[in-house]
Amino acid sequence: MNTRVVSFPPPIDRNPYQALLYRHLADQGVEVGSAGRFTVGWLHENRALVTTLHFHWPEYYYRFDRGPHAARGLLSWARLVLFAVRLTVARRLGYRIVWTVHQLSPHESSSRRLDRAGAWLLARSSHVLIALDRSTAGALAAELSGSAARVRVIPHGSYIGVYPRGRPRAEVRSHLGISGDAFVVLSFGQIRKYKQVDVLVEGFRAAHIPQGALLVAGLPLDGEESRHLAEAAGAGREIVTVLEFVPNEGVAELFDASDVAVTTRIDGGTSGAAVLALSLGLPIVAPSLPAYEELTGGGRAGWHFDSGDAGSLAAALRLAAASPAVRAKKARAALERAERLAWPEIAAQTAAALRPA
């Protein structure tokens, strides 16, 4: 039987991960269907056309994020009941269900109990759970009893060759008001609470790097975090912000204009922004968490600091700034780490997980 898969949610335009995955799955003979609606009616209507339901972020299907805040909790629990019913119908109709677990809990949560229940329901209903790293696989086995035998570790693919290189380094720095001899630390990605912007700014300032510059680029999705960044940028020229969605043609040039990339998120799971940095040959400064240590090869492609500790981050940034020769060595290692995340192999493993037994 041919494998015909539908993604839930459909591929997100502003994140190329899903598009890259399904493009390479097509090369493996997997047919990728158009956007599906996870309803009982859709499940019945498409049973002869679709073999596999592939979930990525299940919170889209049980959270209720509209209307009065006071009613959202109750309505979310009602949606969770519908989610459970639909999963039960999907199993009884014979669909294969696969969940790629980007992180065990959503980035921001108004109810950990709700999100834990949603994860438990989907994990129980899934034939296969795909973890992007070993630490997520371990968390799945520990927190969702009975899931260990169904977990497969298939890493996040690289972004090598996805983004055009863009303008020269000197031109980009000049445009941003950053001097040519500055040591530039890049934080790239959506501005959200779980990214710990306060730790990032405090750690950078505590590092006291001569001619250091912190470049923060990404779409602001959290008003409080964005205001904090704007205030920090207004207090001194060493912090530069590009608080907007960065189009594809502008992504690589920001990394090329920087010396290291930094991430301060501690929610677990594999960071797509960290994979992007490695793919563009930029070493990363990241928390000492198993997923990041796995990604950097135990620090060969970056530096690590104690999670949530601004002082430890400052020390790691000083180390990164201290030696251009060490940075160059780690930059080569970064690209080598990214080259191991080849999409053809990842797609082959994912295709095997998606195929009906």
Language model segments and positions:
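Conserved acidic donor-binding segment of nucleotide-sugar-dependent glycosyltransferases
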Residues: G298-G311, L319-P324, E339
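A charged, aromatic-enriched C-terminal amphipathic alpha-helix characteristic of glycosyltransferases
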Residues: A325-L354
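Nucleotide-activated donor-binding/catalytic signature segment of Leloir-type glycosyltransferases, i.e.
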Residues: S226-A252
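Conserved donor-binding/catalytic core segment of Leloir-type glycosyltransferases
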Residues: S179-K195, V201-F204, L215
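Acidic anion/phosphate-binding donor-loop and adjacent secondary structure
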Residues: G138-A142, S158-H175
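Glycosyltransferase donor-sugar binding loop
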Residues: F188, A213-R227, E244
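Acidic donor-binding loop of glycosyltransferase active sites
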Residues: E253-G269, L282
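Short acidic alpha-helix that forms the nucleotide-activated donor recognition element
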Residues: V246-S258, V275, S279, E293, ...
